[in-house]
Amino acid sequence: MATATTQRPLKGPAKRMSTWTMTREAITIGFDAGDGFLGRLRGSDITRFRCAGRRFVSISHPDYVDHVLHEARLKYVKSDEYGPIRATAGLNLLTDEGDSWARHRGALNSTFARRHLRGLVGLMIDPIADVTAARVPGAQFDMHQSMVETTLRVVANALFSQDFGPLVQSMHDLATRGLRRAEKLERLGLWGLMPRTVYDTLIWCIYSGVHLPPPLREMQEITLTLDRAINSVIDRRLAEPTNSADLLNVLLSADGGIWPRQRVRDEALTFMLAGHETTANAMSWFWYLMALNPQARDHMLTELDDVLGMRRPTADDLGKLAWTTACLQESQRYFSSVWIIAREAVDDDIIDGHRIRRGTTVVIPIHHIHHDPRWWPDPDRFDPGRFLRCPTDRPRCAYLPFGGGRRICIGQSFALMEMVLMAAIMSQHFTFDLAPGYHVELEATLTLRPKHGVHVIGRRR
């Protein structure tokens, strides 16, 4: 297996952090990228620390990340951070490993290719247009809440060819509560504060329906409620088959229709939850940053007027909206929904002269990489032009909004298409400014979201 080349000069000695400090902050503060646990990982390309008896290495140089995600990918698997997700969504492309993951990923790769997704544009546009048409000009509202509703409707339409209607809000509330409970479970499991066997048993109990004490009962209720909702949709489709091009039909027919019912359920639930959560956050940050940068917004509005006017966009229009796409890419750099990923070393390795022992958890703080001035000059400035200039000397792992390597998010093309359509359709009718007195606060759970929403006023164009 490959190791990182040793002829390159070391990026610097490994930084070492206090075990007590890191353990305390993992428990009490959490994973906050500013003042909390991960904020301490700034300023070094590689940081070593222990937390509750487990070994960790944080890598912030794109060459190191490239090594883990590409060159030596067979030496690393997804870490325990995905255990709580497995409790709710089961075994799926996000939580699976090895040959099983490769087989299922291979069966779905072509489905998420751009040429296939073009057929879903109509299913995406209708719910976006409906939510936009219902907007009251001049009224103050929470854009994050609106994006949650919109993305859930888009994913439900593209996945199931139906609108969940009044269920949208309750499903989002369940997903939000679930993420927060999962983050608390992750602190206990990822940081080794309970034996892994106990941790795995708790996950099994949550999923199986065994009676649990109050701290875990809510997580269990969330899991079982979502399970019933998804299974009812699958039951209806099996009882009344359709010729729809939606993703549920793709899952039911994958590999000739031999996937177990439970696997179809797990994948469908994952696409719905992960697909709406990350995209809703990304769009919330997009509107927030556009409100703070009116020149970039005006440039986008001019592009939309020139390309679309007031007609609905089509799949052919997406490639013509270069500035709109660049604004979305820059907002994902500035506030990446997936702001950290982790891998566990299953074999000894060497990263640029630094030894990585088997069993070490390797943390990749995407948020820090996206704000490193070596790859992003003046990183705190919102500059969509970065993605039109495309410098050739920028390392490929300096930009990771969808992760990287062979496990890069399978839904990235779906998400980008959805985001461009939302930006275009909503901006044809409205401009959005921040509400007076609003101040953003970041909340870093398993995703990076605005803690108290993004409060804006929509003005008719």
From Swiss-Prot:
Query: Organism source for this protein?
Result: Mycobacterium tuberculosis (strain ATCC 25618 / H37Rv)
| EC numbers on record | 1.14.-.-
Binding residues annotated for heme, in chain numbering? 409
Q: Which UniProt keywords apply?
A: Heme, Iron, Metal-binding, Monooxygenase, Oxidoreductase
Q: Which cofactor is essential here? A: heme
Task: List the InterPro entries.
Answer: Cyt_P450, Cyt_P450_CS, Cyt_P450_E_grp-I, Cyt_P450_sf, Cytochrome_P450_Monoox
Q: Which Gene3D superfamilies match?
A: Cytochrome P450 (1.10.630.10)
Upper taxonomic classification of the species? Bacteria, Bacillati, Actinomycetota, Actinomycetes, Mycobacteriales
Q: Which GO terms describe its molecular function?
A: heme binding; iron ion binding; monooxygenase activity; oxidoreductase activity, acting on paired donors, with incorporation or reduction of molecular oxygen
Q: What class of enzyme is it?
A: oxidoreductase
Please name the Pfam families in this protein's record: p450
- The answer to whether the entry has keyword Transferase is no
Task: Please give the family membership noted in the entry.
Answer: Belongs to the cytochrome P450 family.
Q: What is this protein called?
A: Putative cytochrome P450 132
